């Protein structure tokens, strides 16, 4: 596993973004882990978050793209900090764009989008925190493709939970890839998280001990993707 991925896993734990215990998800599933990207709240955290996304995007998709698109709401700050980090790390100027939940009907920037306008020929990388159902892409992809003749290069999320979507045996990322025809990737997978944190001390404690590891294993026996 690359060094930046190991650092990112520990960064999520240190930032209180990735937690282990017992959580009820929106789907109703009882999960032994939970990720909340809304816990990134400081300037230094957001700066580092952008750098991790930029590294993963550069490694996966290169720099042949024009726009980073972050769906509202959590995708907005992620797309902004990643655009800054991409320029700082790779000297590449990319634009950011996001959609609005409610269309703005006044001012110079009225409409359904904020940030850069999408143009014919743009190559777009989508950014999200985590995708469990694919619902946000269901809403966003038609918007993006409907406003201009763009190419969606791929999607990058923080964490691939590696579990079945609500509609079948495939993960949300697999379903998105098959439905919309672009690549889907994550900075890290849950398998990599467990591999790195199991019986490892982080912030003075073992984050994934035998009990939590057993709970994760049981969860994936029921909900894991092949």
Map each language-model feature to its residues.
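PRPP-associated nucleotide enzymes
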Residues: 1-127, 132-226
């Amino acid at each position: 596993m690359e060094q930046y991925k190991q650092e990112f896993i520990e960064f999520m734990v240190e930032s209180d973004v990735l937690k282990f215990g017992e959580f009820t998800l929106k789907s109703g599933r009882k999960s032994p882990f939970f990720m909340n990207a809304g816990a990134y709240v400081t300037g230094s955290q957001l700066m580092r978050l952008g750098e991790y996304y930029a590294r993963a995007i550069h490694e996966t998709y290169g720099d042949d793209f024009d726009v980073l698109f972050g769906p509202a709401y959590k995708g907005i700050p992620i797309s902004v900090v990643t655009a800054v980090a991409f320029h700082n790390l790779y000297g590449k100027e990319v634009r950011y764009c996001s959609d609005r939940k409610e269309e703005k009907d006044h001012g110079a920037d009225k409409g359904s989008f904020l940030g850069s306008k999408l143009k014919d020929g743009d190559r777009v990388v989508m950014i999200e925190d985590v995708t469990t159902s694919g619902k946000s892409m269901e809403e966003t992809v038609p918007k993006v493709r409907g406003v201009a003749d763009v190419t969606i290069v791929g999607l990058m999320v923080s964490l691939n939970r590696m579990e079945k979507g609500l509609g079948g045996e495939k993960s949300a990322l697999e379903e998105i890839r098959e439905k919309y025809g672009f690549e889907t990737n994550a900075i890290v997978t849950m398998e990599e998280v467990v591999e790195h944190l199991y019986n490892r001390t982080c912030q003075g404690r073992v984050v994934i001990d035998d009990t939590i590891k057993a709970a994760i294993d049981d969860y994936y026996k029921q909900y894991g993707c092949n």
